[in-house]
Amino acid sequence: MTGSGGAVIRPASPDDHDAIWQILRPVYRAGKTYCIPRDITRDDALADWFAQPFTAFVAEVDGRILGTSHVGANRPGGGAHVANASFATHPEARGRGLARALAQHALSWARAQGYRAMQFNFVVSTNLDAVHLWQTVGFGVVGRLPGAFLHPRHGPVDALVMFQTLKGDSDEP
């Protein structure tokens, strides 16, 4: 799939591990947006990113991987009809529409897989760019977890639960 700014979004492979780690490492080390140990190892981070039931994707611009996402069931069993996704982009991708392209791809992919909704369980409220992006692609805030994230600079901040229905009223159950 070709996304915004000429990005090609495709399923990730083991050959992409180094590039994905180069994107994830600074995000995780900063500790501002994910509930991931800041000192997570490369192997543990990649095992998590590629873990079932998720499918990992990369976004390439001019042959260079500048973004990644993974999409899969939010919960097993009775919650398996709701998707979840995570995203990260390289700093060079800022302002180029790559995060939006990854989000739109994730939503399209989830619809094609038969998911009826997508939920983000833990969006850090101080991650204003992400909150704004998710709202502009159709997510609403359906819950607020007071002080649930320990931000390295701001201390305890709220985490948001964001949700979007993927199927319309005319869709069969």
Which residues are covered by each model-predicted region?
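A short beta-loop-alpha structural element at the N-terminal edge
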Residues: V8-I20
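Terminal substrate-recognition subdomain of acyl/acetyltransferases
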Residues: T2-G5, F87-A88, F122, L145-G147, ...
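Conserved GNAT acetyl-CoA-binding A-motif
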Residues: A110-V123
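Conserved acetyl-CoA-binding loop of GNAT-fold acetyltransferases
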Residues: Q135-L145
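Acetyl-CoA-dependent GNAT
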Residues: P14, A30-E92, A103-Q104, W109, ...
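Hydrophobic pocket/interface hotspot
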Residues: I20, L24, A45
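Conserved beta-strand-loop-alpha-helix junction that forms the acyl-donor binding cleft
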Residues: R94, F120-A130, A148-L150
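Conserved acetyl-CoA-binding loop-helix of GNAT-fold acetyltransferases
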Residues: G95-A112, V131-T136
